[in-house]
Amino acid sequence: MVTPFPEVSEWLCIGQIVGAHGLRGEVKVKPFSDFPERFTVPGCRWLRSPRQPQPYAVTLLRGRFLPRAEQFVVTFAEISDRTAAEALKGAEILVPASDRPPLAANEYHLMDLIGLAVYHQGERVGEVVGLVNAGNDLLEVQLLDPAPKAPQSVYIPFVPAIVPVVDLAARRIEIDPPLGLLP
């Protein structure tokens, strides 16, 4: 049976290939997902790269986590040597958005936070433009009106004490940052 081809708008990027590992076609993956089984459980995944923007199916055979590097090493059936693995550097690993795991109350898919307006004391101060996993997740917020010589963006720890309100329906979050976090 052929795997149905989801619409491009339905993709969820779960990681990026950052290089080859070894001589047998394994690749190193920087994960963007908090669900390790996406990189260890065999099955269909999709790749998209700048050289091939149309996603194509690959078969994940196995994967393992490298804790020191905070990366996964994965094996795809279609990649059998280092040269082929190196050619995938920069490619995104995708799954259909419909494959998102269900979440508990007050949990969010971090990618859903990108583009949300950020408010502090009722005033819009910026927009979430990125995410960084640094122990705790950090929201990269591009400031609307930064002071001269001030940073254009700041990193806000995504913890309930600092981000008490997330309203996905209204496309906004409210922050209560400690003194000095905002310029």
From Swiss-Prot:
GO CC annotations, alphabetized: cytoplasm; ribosome
GO molecular function terms noted in the UniProt entry: ribosome binding
Keywords from the UniProt entry: Chaperone, Cytoplasm, Ribosome biogenesis, rRNA processing
GO biological process: ribosomal small subunit biogenesis; rRNA processing
Subcellular location: Cytoplasm
Family: Belongs to the RimM family.
NCBIfam families hit by this protein: 16S_RimM
Purpose of the protein: An accessory protein needed during the final step in the assembly of 30S ribosomal subunit, possibly for assembly of the head region. Essential for efficient processing of 16S rRNA. May be needed both before and after RbfA during the maturation of 16S rRNA. It has affinity for free ribosomal 30S subunits but not for 70S ribosomes.
PANTHER family with a match to the protein in the record: RIBOSOME MATURATION FACTOR RIMM
Protein name: Ribosome maturation factor RimM
